[in-house]
Amino acid sequence: MKKLLLTSLVALGLSISANAADKSKTIIVGATPIPHAEILEVVKPILAKDGYTLEIKEFNDYTTPNLATEDGDLDANFFQHLPYLDEFNKNKGTHLIKTVGVHLEPMGVYSKKIKDIKDLKDGSTVSIPNDPTNESRALDILANAGLIKLNDNPLKTPLDIVDNPKKLKFEEIETAQVPRTLDDVTIAVINTNYALNANLNPVKDALVLESKNSPYVNYVVVKSGNENSPKIKALDKAINSSEVKKFIEIKYNGAILPAF
């Protein structure tokens, strides 16, 4: 009986050790489907060479993956730029930090009603994201296109428009839902990941495309304190590899730009 008990305890100990080893070699990353999860699929075999298993969890919003990373359900996430991350930490009290930059997604202005931004009529309706950083970013694009003028506030809303010569009307929409408004508005300012998901080609379809000098690089994000763990270091190295850079350049053909 004692021998049986000892054998069972040894087996249990081995099982626990194996599970701990498996966890240390498994990297769970949350991402939006396009392009982030697509890029992570390229990272999988690179990490496998170093003995790591990459699990990709897909999300269709910008809130859940950050909360899951804060809570430890994800080792990292990959979907956001630094202004959004900073604003999220401030509003939610989270402790998330960036590690490496991966790519830039130039935001664009799209329409099913007009073919050229010069054809935009007075009183047209414009849909823009409603989260603070992407809303401000969208308004900056419209200002750079000469459609409106803004004050100097760092984060802008339609209330910060100081000149609106075309008397444009603005609808603030949840970021992921902006592409769905294209049938109802004249123009929509859409994040590139959601544009691609809606089968829009930023290079061919955007009436206005954000400057390539935009500061909105997308980063790998982890909870503070985890940035130097072996598996995060392995993830950072793999996602900044030449294989990933080549994939971004070929797959997205200028719609998305490598940032390393």
Residue ranges and their predicted role:
Residues 87-99, 114, 184, 189, ...:
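Ligand-binding "clamshell"
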Residues 56-67, 154-180:
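Short helix-initiation/N-cap motifs at beta->coil->alpha
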Residues 18-28, 47-48, 116-123:
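Immediate post-signal peptide segment of exported/extracytoplasmic ligand-binding proteins
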Residues 106-117, 217-229:
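A bilobed periplasmic-binding-protein/Venus flytrap-type ligand-binding module shared by bacterial periplasmic
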